[in-house]
């Protein structure tokens, strides 16, 4: 594999596809001309360009160290026109699409004395590579998986026999004890979560008294945008808009007819990063470094807001 260029996109072809259950699809991708794809670390995801105006992020499931290919898995929502339903239709064996280089806002901490992985449903996908890496490094770890009916467990592959993995199947009356896990974890343990919003809120409540540097999570959906209203000025067009509580800059601009590239709406992918000309941003993303935020040069308009009455953007 090759080093990452964050600005690259790659044409990939579907070389295999399998249904782990009625609603869970696993797809393997290789570069269309069979050139090496970028290497990636546990927790990484790629943007998949489902259509020209529809981009979605999917975690990379490690296939094996010997393969220069990517695996993703997703749960199909049976809503007509949903992104996952379109993915299911378009990503058939032989089909091609474009993906971004891998990005990682959910990285394992190499200094963690112990790692606790907690996931719900299809949130297992980033955890598989994490667990494989921890096994290989012989570092202490455990994984706790909540699943409605166990469909996602096939993604574990050879990890399925590991004693470090606990399964909680809700259809059998099991419930993942997030608070107990957080309370029992040593103070220097790092906790990772990926799963649905309800479980995320339970995880955040259970870990609120822990060192924030040891608490890591990925969201399935964007959190509500809260805060005082402010004005956004567009330097190039001279347009001016008010962003109210509950709205994002991205939403306001799109509703006004501006085409702004975006994808995750959670402040993790970087596609909506915009140059800031003036004003004080309220950075709420999980992508920019502390020094990048302090510089005030750019902001992610899908989630970040303003600490000043006005912002002027290079748009």
UniProtKB/Swiss-Prot annotation:
CDD domains: fer2 (cd00207), PDR_like (cd06185). Residues 228-315 form the 2Fe-2S ferredoxin-type domain. [2Fe-2S] cluster binds at residues 264, 269, 272, 302. It is an enzyme of class 1 (oxidoreductase). Residues 7-109 form the FAD-binding FR-type domain. FMN binds at residues 1-103. Its cofactor is FMN. It comes from the Bacteria. One of its GO terms (biological process) is catabolic process. Pfam families: FAD_binding_6, Fer2. GO terms for molecular function: 2 iron, 2 sulfur cluster binding; metal ion binding; oxidoreductase activity. Its EC number is 1.14.-.-. The keyword Electron transport applies. Keywords: 2Fe-2S, Aromatic hydrocarbons catabolism, Electron transport, Flavoprotein, FMN, Iron, Iron-sulfur, Metal-binding, NAD, Oxidoreductase, Transport. Belongs to the PDR/VanB family. PANTHER family: PROTEIN YIIM (PTHR30212:SF2). This dioxygenase system consists of two proteins: phthalate oxygenase and phthalate oxygenase reductase. This is 3-chlorobenzoate-3,4-dioxygenase reductase subunit.
